[in-house]
Amino acid sequence: MQIRHFLQFKDFDRQEYEYLFDRTRWIKNEFKQYRRYWPLTDRTLAMIFEKHSTRTRLSFEAGMHQLGGSAIYLSTRDTQLGRGEPVEDAARVISRMVDIITLRTHEHGVIERFAENSRVPVINGLTDEYHPCQILADIFTFMEHRGSIAGKTVAWIGDSNNVCNTWLQAAEVFDFNVHVSTPPGYEVEPERAGLYGTDHYEQFVSPHDAVKDADLVTTDVWTSMGFEDEADTRKNDFADFRVDAEMMACAKEEALFMHCLPAHRGEEVDAEVIDGPQSVVWDEAENRLHTQKALMEYLLLGRIGVR
């Protein structure tokens, strides 16, 4: 079977995602029914993390165990990567000892170089540029609650970060619209915006205008990992971009709210929104587990048929 990697959302087509979501539904149901499903017995996942993580690490580690395999966590601080070993050399060695790898790092170029030299599938557990596993779970969560996302409108409020970038790629795959509203100076990079065009992406100055008639409102922390030195400046710059009840009222009545977590109540979102009836953030977080189990199954076994 040809080795496939999952480094960006555009690495798979819509048909493949529909298959993954079908598998996710079945795998999640088996999990809820406490039925054992071990298709990855004797397979090993290596998780190489340069950045801190709660949900990504836990969902991959628990997911691999629940599929019958085992998982090994490697921090770059504890390996030779942290002492300057070339990424290419690390990929060649590690991929001879395990069956699949999740890499969470800063520069997206690092994971591309790693994948080019790996003998096994590599999954992007987050880079500064993309977070495809998060959007995989987000779209599945939307489908659970509202059906197909095709033709819908997603409003992204806040920093145009890696999650925002991935939403833009997903809009191309699933044919939905993304409204982005950021403070001046934090807009989607012009060269990146040019990749998507106005059919699926539109930039708004006012967050309330961006949210108008949206089916899904989503945001993230104002200060992503690696930008801690800018925290005070960002709090001032993003002060008008907090998702509150007034902003949610501009969206459709049945609109959902998502946040990839961790959240800072009173900053990017008010407590009454994230803890309110429109919020599906806890389903969203749980679905990281189920979608990534389907992803690992697909990368290691290919299509096995929907049960």
Swiss-Prot record:
GO terms for cellular component: cytoplasm. The keyword Cytoplasm applies. Transmembrane segments: none annotated. It is found in: Cytoplasm. GO terms for molecular function: amino acid binding; ornithine carbamoyltransferase activity. L-ornithine binds at N162, D220, S224, M225. InterPro entries: Asp/Orn_carbamoyltranf_P-bd (IPR006132), Asp/Orn_carbamoylTrfase (IPR006130), Asp/Orn_carbamoylTrfase_sf (IPR036901), Asp_carbamoyltransf_Asp/Orn-bd (IPR006131), Orn/put_carbamltrans (IPR002292), OTCase_ArgI (IPR024904). PROSITE patterns: CARBAMOYLTRANSFERASE. The keyword Protein biosynthesis does not apply. Its EC number is 2.1.3.3. Keywords: Amino-acid biosynthesis, Arginine biosynthesis, Cytoplasm, Transferase. Pathway: Amino-acid biosynthesis; L-arginine biosynthesis; L-arginine from L-ornithine and carbamoyl phosphate: step 1/3. Reversibly catalyzes the transfer of the carbamoyl group from carbamoyl phosphate (CP) to the N(epsilon) atom of ornithine (ORN) to produce L-citrulline. Belongs to the aspartate/ornithine carbamoyltransferase superfamily. OTCase family. This is Ornithine carbamoyltransferase. It comes from Nitrosomonas europaea (strain ATCC 19718 / CIP 103999 / KCTC 2705 / NBRC 14298). The gene is argF.
